[in-house]
């Protein structure tokens, strides 16, 4: 299986025995860390970064003493080995090598491989306590749960969903997709004010990025961009609909501008551009988030946001707000696609008209979606491939395959070339496999409408992309969401406490310990499995639009279901495999 049972060791701080499942790189529960005396400005200083993980650095000796005893069969003493005595890093390398040697030792109840990884990570953590400009997804723990059962079970569940859907009558799916429950109406005036307020908040955050703390965990700009917007708002879009259409920082300023200069109000975007601008911009965003060495540096992020907001506003003036927000501005295009999975529907979807709200089944709006052009298909597949590569790029397997010792992680700067190539290759591989699955399915069904089929069936990627987004960023959202609450009370690092949260203890314990590990893993695994099952359901509903005959529709979906089963296994493996950061 992919992981052994949880290890139990003594807690060096309290003497209590408990399972060890995670090792945090970032901010632990501050309740365990005494605050330092007031600084020159009369406010409390936060603990220095180098002291945050003292307990982890000090505990690896107890790990070895408890788990392995005084020696192994080979006579190597982990606690006093010459290789392990010079530094935590050399100790980590010793664990990396000796962990495999102990695989056939007398300790049959503990997987030596997983133990070596866990001890190595514990020894390595102190070497990464300096400020790290990474992005929100770094989970920094080693999963030691018996995850192989979940992988097999998830694959079986997705495959079984195909068999169940293959015998369902098409009319049942049509009734489900068409059912709506009206819940009210609203006008558009409030949207202008909310968007204008969002623009003002963005301006304050940009100023905080330039003038505030350089610590990404203390500055509200990177926490807002990478945690609250990119993680939290994406999930809100998938549940409640297109919230971004109200909260984006362009709509209000554009309405004000177009009222002053009405000649620009009815501009349209050329159809030939399709989704290519959004595709290019999202590829740049993904590279900045995943590859660029310092995406969380507040000042750099602030200047990047200023340039992007201004260039986007100019494009909206030239091409019209509606056209550019649908197919040019990548966040709006992505959020609009994701919102098709939501349980809330707004109609009509036009900025100048009132809207009616109604409830629907999750994913029901995807069944009525129109086929995407080639650029739209590539855009949607890129959103999934980028988050998938983000998980892959941190794994021991990826780093080892590229000649990088995962226990001596050199940092992003040394991996720019490798990871840039990997990001492109992951995208190409996903496109090739998805297109091949649709092509083979259409041939099996006796159809030659490949272009229309792939443009329609690509909408089934939306539930998978949402599931990966949730699972991949869950731990970051739980911890960095708290950091954001702290940072917004003192955006300029002046000792303020605007909202009463500046001195709030950030509880990393919410994701630490055996109970938390078990709960989080089950949520993540359930999201991955559930997302793929819903993707199979959406694909079947779309297939009936292409092939009214139930047998042909089911036959066309067989290769795509195989692809989704394989991607389920891949996603669960990404969650369970050891990572370097």
State where each predicted segment sits.
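N-terminal secretory/membrane targeting signals
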Residues: 93-96, 100-134
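Alpha-helical transmembrane segments and their helix-start/interface "positive-inside/aromatic belt" motifs
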Residues: 113-114, 146-153, 184-196, 222-230, ...
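Transmembrane-helix bundle segments that line or gate the permeation/cavity pathway
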Residues: 119, 123, 138-142, 149-356, ...
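Membrane-interfacial helical/loop segments at transmembrane boundaries in membrane proteins
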Residues: 134-136, 256-257, 396-412, 483-511, ...
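Membrane-interface segments at the starts/ends of alpha-helical transmembrane spans
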Residues: 137-152, 215-226, 364-367, 404-421, ...
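Long, contiguous internal "core" modules enriched in hydrophobic/ aromatic residues
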Residues: 259-465, 475-478, 482
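Hydrophobic alpha-helical transmembrane segments and adjacent short intramembrane/lumenal linkers
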Residues: 461-469, 473, 479-530, 536-540, ...
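Juxtamembrane boundary at the C-terminal end of a transmembrane helix
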Residues: 571-581
